[in-house]
């Protein structure tokens, strides 16, 4: 059940409880000495003896219930039976302590054989991250939280959710993906329920696409069998082979064939791509020149252009895949190009994350080090907020 140093830690904790379980075979000074005339035969002491025995039995029940609650695989049948029916009389305060102890332990250790107990779905934290840590992406802030939360709160979704993030490098695609992972799963990217694939790293050679398909299908199936809520992230999605993306088709069809339905009720596919980021920039620049404010730009201004351009792009497998052609992607989410003011905010956040003091002049210096385009307007940072941390190190050296 408990192994290594954990056993000593929990035994020490249990000693603090009234009537903590004693080692087997340990004798008590008052047992076997109740002959007439003995001090142990005093009626008051006998009542105390009975109360101590009852307290000891209760502590053993605490321990048995807690261990079976946290380590169900290691819980022996006789231990489960010893807990008695659910209605056994556990004092209210003791139940609260037990719940607190279980919650505390499960906050940093696995408590069940599946990864489900590590799913947090912290939508409040996700909302805070999107609104406070992400800059210049009002469309992402509006759409991602609403879409993901709505999907995960649907009792029986008809299909997996597919979101495709598009935009220039450094605009926040990977940043938002990490926010999702960290707020939906306690273990983040280390969660058994999350898988991340980088196209050029995991699937580098087109000639092995059939082998990659088998491997991908196997990993998806194993992850779904382990967790009822899974997340699969595909970085550099524009470099994925169209045949490889076919594997995902059955999960994204609204009425998938019976043999191809997702084994986990909730599955999210997240695609990250720089594909057609230039189109997003062109549309945004045109709207800004026409007098629109950045915050007035809507999905209707961008998504139709973005989707059409992705389909027409010749040199990428993602646009030619069945997922795009048959509209199996739920949302193409544009990440807008970042301006000078957004770069300053990224620099400020980088200082704060390292608990470093900064001056407003320093933020300006860092922002001015970035290259801005187009050549005439000098409006958008060509690298977004990428390399901000490295530039801060320059000021600290």
Swiss-Prot record:
Binding site residues for ATP: 167-174
Tissue localization of expression: Ubiquitously expressed. Highest expression in stomach, salivary glands and lymph nodes. Isoform 2 is expressed in placenta.
InterPro entries reported for this sequence: P-loop_NTPase, TOR1A_C, Torsin
N-terminal signal peptide: 1-25
A Pfam family assignment: Torsin
Positions annotated with a glycan in the UniProt record: 122
Presence of the UniProt keyword Repeat in the record: no
Recorded superkingdom: Eukaryota
Protein localization: Cytoplasm; Endoplasmic reticulum lumen
Principal location class: cytoplasm
Gene3D superfamilies per the UniProt record, alphabetical: P-loop containing nucleotide triphosphate hydrolases
UniProt keywords, alphabetically: ATP-binding, Cytoplasm, Endoplasmic reticulum, Glycoprotein, Nucleotide-binding, Signal
PTM summary: N-glycosylated.
A cellular component term, taken from the record's GO annotations: endoplasmic reticulum lumen
Molecular function, one GO term: ATP binding
Matches recorded under PANTHER family: TORSIN, TORSIN-3A
Quaternary organization: May not form homohexamers.
Family stated for the protein in its record: Belongs to the ClpA/ClpB family. Torsin subfamily.
Name of the protein in its database record: Torsin-3A
Organism encoding this protein: Homo sapiens
């Amino acid at each position: 059940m408990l192994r290594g140093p954990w056993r000593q830690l929990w035994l020490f904790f249990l000693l603090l409880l009234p009537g903590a379980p004693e080692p087997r075979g340990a004798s008590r000074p008052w047992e076997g000495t109740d002959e007439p005339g003995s001090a142990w035969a005093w009626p008051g002491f006998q009542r105390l003896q009975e109360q101590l025995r009852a307290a000891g039995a209760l502590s053993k029940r605490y321990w048995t219930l807690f261990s079976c609650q946290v380590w169900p695989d290691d819980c022996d049948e006789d231990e489960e039976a010893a807990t008695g029916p659910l209605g056994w009389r556990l004092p209210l305060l003791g139940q609260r302590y037990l719940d607190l102890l279980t919650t505390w332990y499960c906050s940093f250790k696995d408590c069940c054989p599946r990864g489900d107990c590590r799913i947090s779905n912290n939508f409040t934290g996700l909302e805070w991250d999107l609104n406070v840590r992400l800059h210049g992406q009002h469309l992402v802030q509006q759409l991602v939280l609403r879409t993901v939360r709505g999907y995960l709160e649907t009792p029986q979704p008809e299909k997996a959710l597919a979101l495709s993030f598009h935009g220039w490098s450094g605009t926040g695609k990977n940043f938002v993906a990490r926010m999702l992972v960290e707020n939906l799963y306690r273990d983040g990217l280390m969660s058994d329920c999350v898988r991340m694939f980088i196209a050029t790293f995991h699937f580098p050679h087109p000639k092995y696409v059939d082998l990659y398909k088998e491997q991908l299908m196997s990993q998806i199936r194993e992850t779904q069998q382990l967790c009822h809520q899974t997340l699969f992230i595909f970085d550099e999605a524009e470099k994925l082979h169209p045949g490889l993306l076919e594997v995902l088709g059955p999960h994204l069809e609204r009425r998938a064939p019976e043999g191809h339905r997702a084994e986990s009720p909730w599955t999210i596919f997240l695609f990250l791509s720089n594909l057609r980021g230039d189109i997003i920039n062109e549309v945004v620049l045109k709207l800004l020149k026409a007098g629109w404010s950045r915050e007035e730009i809507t999905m209707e201004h961008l998504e139709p252009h973005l989707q059409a351009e992705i389909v027409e792009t010749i040199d990428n497998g993602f646009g030619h895949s069945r997922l795009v052609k048959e509209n199996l992607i739920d949302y193409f989410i544009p990440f807008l190009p970042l301006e000078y003011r957004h770069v300053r905010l990224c620099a400020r956040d980088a200082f704060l994350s390292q608990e470093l003091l900064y001056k407003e002049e320093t933020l300006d210096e860092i922002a001015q080090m970035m290259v801005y385009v187009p050549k005439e307007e000098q409006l958008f940072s060509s690298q977004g907020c990428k390399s901000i941390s490295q530039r801060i190190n320059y000021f600290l050296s």
